[in-house]
Swiss-Prot record:
This is UPF0335 protein A1G_00885. It comes from the Bacteria. Coiled coil: none annotated. It comes from Rickettsia rickettsii (strain Sheila Smith). GO terms for molecular function: DNA binding. Belongs to the UPF0335 family. NCBIfam families: PRK13694.1. Transmembrane segments: none annotated.
Length: 78
């Protein structure tokens, strides 16, 4: 491969990564804005983030986590 081709490929990779990093930053800001809007309408952002994490778990893992949490709460009288 010639140096020109290698340079062009490298520039393309770098350009793609930079574009994706900017898109990621833009999306992150949009998510923050949505949480801020939800908060201004009285929603609990911390609870919403917890729900989002729980939704990522498969049903068996979620049931296992719920059972363990209930056991610990019962043990501690909470």
């Amino acid at each position: 491969m010639s140096e020109v081709v290698i340079k062009e490929q490298l520039e393309q990779y770098i350009s793609k990564i930079e574009r994706l990093e900017q898109e990621k930053a833009d999306l992150s800001q949009e998510v923050k804005d949505i949480f801020q809007d939800a908060s201004s309408h009285g929603f609990d952002v911390k609870a919403m983030k917890s729900i989002l994490k729980l939704k990522k778990l498969d049903k068996d893992k979620l049931a296992e986590q719920d059972a363990m949490l209930e056991l610990y709460r019962d043990t501690l009288g909470i």
